[in-house]
């Protein structure tokens, strides 16, 4: 697992706005987790998906996801886990979508530690998130741009 550093702040997402995190993974991997606050709301549901990156946010989302999971009643600061068959090193999009039932967010890092790009409604924004990744082989560099 890769552990990030920096000051973390919970950031609330806007309901109905898909959130994307594009990252270059430096080794094969088979799961990731996001620690996601709900500010005490107990009925939050969301869909967590992984896509192989394809040119831009919209084109990527038109393709079938590598893996997807509907999460019901996500606990406050619970770890949203997505497991899948081993994927090769490369560029991917993590998508948080279809969330409802209360507030939902993620822990934003004070410094860019993963060379990630964040998308809100398809628009690229600067942000870095607390993400744990399970690599199946030891990476020389966990993440690349």
Placement of each model-derived feature along the sequence:
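Beta-sheet-rich sandwich/jelly-roll-like modules and their strand-loop junctions
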Residues: 1-62, 73-145
């Amino acid at each position: 697992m890769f552990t990030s550093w920096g000051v973390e702040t919970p950031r609330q997402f806007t309901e109905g706005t898909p959130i994307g995190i594009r990252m270059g993974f430096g080794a094969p991997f088979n799961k990731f987790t996001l620690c996601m606050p709900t500010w005490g709301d107990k009925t939050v549901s969301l869909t967590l998906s992984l896509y192989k990156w394809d040119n831009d946010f919209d084109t990527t989302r038109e393709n079938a996801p590598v893996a997807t999971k509907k999460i019901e009643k996500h606990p406050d600061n619970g770890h949203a886990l997505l497991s899948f068959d081993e994927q090769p090193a490369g560029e991917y999009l993590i998508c948080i979508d279809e969330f409802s039932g209360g507030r939902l967010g993620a822990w934003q890092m004070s410094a860019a530690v993963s060379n990630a790009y964040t998308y809100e409604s398809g628009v690229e924004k600067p942000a870095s998130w607390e993400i744990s990744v399970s690599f199946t082989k030891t990476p020389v560099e966990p993440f690349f741009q």
